[in-house]
Amino acid sequence: MNRKVTVVGAGNVGATLAQRIADRELADVVLIDIIEGMPQGKGLDIMEATPVEGSDSRVIGTNDYKDTAGSEIVIITAGIARKPGMSRDDLLNTNYQIVKTCTENAAKHSPNAILMVVSNPLDAMCQVAFKVSGFPKRRVFGMAGVLDSARMRTFIAMELGVSVENTHAFVLGGHGDTMVPLPRYSTVSGVPITELLPADRIEAIVKRTAGGGAEIVSLLKTGSAYYAPSASTAEMVAAVLKDKHKVLPCCCYLEGEFGIKDLYVGVPAQLGAVGIEKIWEIKLTDQERATLHKSADAVRELVSIMKL
């Protein structure tokens, strides 16, 4: 492999993501962390699995950003994880400094890279990466909607007893309690779930989707989700590296779309080799639009605290 992807942060999300990228032979992977030995050990462990997986991707772990030079994609997963009782917003001040430093280093060594942000609070951290890197908006975006939509798809499949492959869902807005699941655009084999389920069951699915991350945090007690987040990020990585022109819900910088300006919020976007190719401004009802704006207001409040 010649293509290089850097994963910043060798914690649960970062290491699992590195493994998924290598297993799918999408690129060579550089796993970087400030803790000496951890990225090297995990990188070697993942590399030693590649013969079994039939992958020729190379994986290295490092503490030196020089090893990340020339990456096509840099994925920032670094930051502290949530604990029970914490919201994603509680991570703001600590993760702001972490994401700022990671972005500065990534931009210095890979000035032409696409920056993909996974660290929470997601939408605010995207704003940090965008401002600090100076990259164009198409090359800085975040992973949230793919994960939230995957959770909603899971709950739809469980409710109806169908294959998850038959389900599609769209979740917009901020990656937090104010996210906006859209039942009208959520389907089973093309049929909207509003025609398949009563309102109370749909409401239960929407509520569980919004609390999906917190549910896992409360069960784990010592950390947060990483299997589904890493799988969701890998799907976005594949869409970029394979130039798929794939429409996925991503955290994008809006300049008037959906009536939202100068802010990162989750919306449908087309992903390809250049990053965000296009934002799909789907039609929303007045209520859906108002809910999306409420979600955006919550993100804007967080961003204002950071005084970027």
Question: What residues fall within each predicted segment?
Answer:
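Rossmann-like NAD(P)(H) cofactor-binding subdomain of soluble oxidoreductases
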Residues: 87-153
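NAD(P)+-binding Rossmann beta1-loop-alpha1 motif at the extreme N-terminus of oxidoreductases
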Residues: 1-42
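Conserved N-terminal Rossmann-fold NAD(P) cofactor-binding segment
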Residues: 32-72, 300-308
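Short, well-ordered alpha-helices that flank and scaffold nucleotide-derived cofactor binding pockets
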Residues: 19-23, 44, 48, 104, ...
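Rossmann-like NAD(P)-binding element
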Residues: 51-114
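C-terminal substrate-binding/catalytic lobe of Rossmann-fold NAD(P)-dependent dehydrogenases
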Residues: 133-139, 148-308
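Short glycine-enriched loops at secondary-structure junctions
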Residues: 11, 119-123, 270
